[in-house]
Amino acid sequence: PYEKIGAELVKEVAKKTDDVAGDGTTTATVLAQALVKEGLRNVAAGANPLGLKRGIEKAVEKVTETLLKGAKEVETKEQIAATAAISAGDQSIGDLIAEAMDKVGNEGVITVEESNTFGL
């Protein structure tokens, strides 16, 4: 039963991460899996589950605070292109994404679909 609960939790983490950020699902899944595994191990060893939960919540707050301190706004077309190029692993795709974002604006939506045509 615990394995099923853990699997459902990890699935939910991946879905929520994808919905909110659109990226990072692998990292979130690995972290969630480690938290579940270590949490169950600690509970089996006698740790208080509520104490573990509170500790995890405090750690999440601290990590979030630290990440937000180091975060930088991506504002210019060049910054968008550079960030997108890193994510895509391809500068030309980064440039295309920056161009599309420039055209639709901050509130616009860009839909990317896989092509079935060779070379496109």
Swiss-Prot record:
GO terms for biological process: protein refolding. It is found in: Cytoplasm. GO terms for molecular function: ATP binding; ATP-dependent protein folding chaperone; isomerase activity. The keyword Isomerase applies. Keywords: ATP-binding, Chaperone, Cytoplasm, Isomerase, Nucleotide-binding, Stress response. ATP binds at D23, G24, T25, T26, T27. It comes from the Bacteria. Its main location: cytoplasm. One of its GO terms (cellular component) is cytoplasm. Belongs to the chaperonin (HSP60) family. This is Chaperonin GroEL. The gene is groEL.
